[in-house]
Amino acid sequence: MAVTGACTNKKLYLAAPRGYCAGVDRAVVTVEKALEVYGAPVYVRKQIVHNRHVVETLEGRGAIFVDELDEVPDDALVVFSAHGVSPQVKKEATDRGLRTIDATCPLVTKVHHEAKRFANQDTQILLIGHAGHEEVEGTTGEAPENITLVQTPADVDGLALDRDRPVAWLSQTTLSVDETVETVDRIRDLHPQLIDPPSDDICYATQNRQHAVKQMAPQCDLVIVVGSKNSSNTGRLVEVALESGAKASYRVDNAGEIEETWLDGVSTIGVTSGASVPEALVQGVIDLLISKGWPPAEEETLIEESLSFALPPQLRKRRTTAK
């Protein structure tokens, strides 16, 4: 992955794929389209995606973000975020007569369906994920009596499971692929008959972005990951960069958060971004680094992504392009 035409030993690499995934694009466009069709305000339960810039931009267009439905006025329109909600939240909205649009990523919805199917078979479900994350809360709500949360491989040894009932595992869609494999292997050591989900729960975009960083990181003195602090998949990219050989890796919301000391003695920098990050924020980082003497970025595409998801039924007649 050589940089051509640069009269310097400095190198700048740009990982691909990066940034928006199909689920994020669908969720952001859902709010934009709802504002266009129904007018402001449009309420959104939780952040539509975990990116500060996206949320602030939508707020400027008339979206109002709330933590819970009791903050939403009667008869208002509310959008459920890409991370999904529990059946209890949907019932609360129905009971109050709120108009709703569900922007849950279809890949998260798939995990919800798997949880319900396993629960209907009286299967114990080990959900690998992060406590407090909206996606984990939504999935747990589908089968609360069957699901036990497992956050790390170390949690496995303390599990108290019924040996007479089957055990299956599911996962949050934005986890580290390697750590999830380690956790599943640990579970299977104790429960050899462990049942796998029908297909990977970790989404294609999470896996692709991690694989792209793995390819880039060994060549880098520094990997900069663009994304917000509360973005799970962004945090995992920092971890993957360090585990894959980068000498240092930091997360930034935008170019303004890059510290000068990070660049001291650094010649090779890699840049990537989480799945809810607009490309403009990545370009801002590239522009800053070029202004400080790095050559134009060399991009190598690991895999082309072409997946897209249909908008929620209420909004399918006309579609706008996400900015």
From Swiss-Prot:
Cofactor notes: Binds 1 [4Fe-4S] cluster per subunit.
Pathway annotation from the record: Isoprenoid biosynthesis; dimethylallyl diphosphate biosynthesis; dimethylallyl diphosphate from (2E)-4-hydroxy-3-methylbutenyl diphosphate: step 1/1; Isoprenoid biosynthesis; isopentenyl diphosphate biosynthesis via DXP pathway; isopentenyl diphosphate from 1-deoxy-D-xylulose 5-phosphate: step 6/6
Keyword Cell cycle: no
Catalytic reaction list: isopentenyl diphosphate + 2 oxidized [2Fe-2S]-[ferredoxin] + H2O = (2E)-4-hydroxy-3-methylbut-2-enyl diphosphate + 2 reduced [2Fe-2S]-[ferredoxin] + 2 H(+); dimethylallyl diphosphate + 2 oxidized [2Fe-2S]-[ferredoxin] + H2O = (2E)-4-hydroxy-3-methylbut-2-enyl diphosphate + 2 reduced [2Fe-2S]-[ferredoxin] + 2 H(+)
InterPro entries for this protein: LytB/IspH
EC class name: oxidoreductase
Molecular function as annotated in GO: 4 iron, 4 sulfur cluster binding; 4-hydroxy-3-methylbut-2-enyl diphosphate reductase activity; metal ion binding
Binding site for isopentenyl diphosphate: 50, 83, 133, 231-233, 276
Entries under Pfam families matching the protein: LYTB
Binding-site positions, (2E)-4-hydroxy-3-methylbut-2-enyl diphosphate: 50, 83, 133, 173, 231-233, 276
Keyword vocabulary terms for this entry: 4Fe-4S, Iron, Iron-sulfur, Isoprene biosynthesis, Metal-binding, Oxidoreductase
Keyword Cell inner membrane: no
EC number: 1.17.7.4
UniProt binding sites for dimethylallyl diphosphate: 50, 83, 133, 231-233, 276
Gene3D superfamilies: 3.40.50.11270, 4-hydroxy-3-methylbut-2-enyl diphosphate reductase, catalytic domain (3.40.1010.20)
GO BP annotation list: dimethylallyl diphosphate biosynthetic process; isopentenyl diphosphate biosynthetic process, methylerythritol 4-phosphate pathway; terpenoid biosynthetic process
Names of the cofactor(s): [4Fe-4S] cluster
Family of the protein in this entry: Belongs to the IspH family.
Function (record text): Catalyzes the conversion of 1-hydroxy-2-methyl-2-(E)-butenyl 4-diphosphate (HMBPP) into a mixture of isopentenyl diphosphate (IPP) and dimethylallyl diphosphate (DMAPP). Acts in the terminal step of the DOXP/MEP pathway for isoprenoid precursor biosynthesis.
Protein name: 4-hydroxy-3-methylbut-2-enyl diphosphate reductase
Organism: Cutibacterium acnes (strain DSM 16379 / KPA171202)
Lineage per the UniProt record: Bacteria, Bacillati, Actinomycetota, Actinomycetes, Propionibacteriales
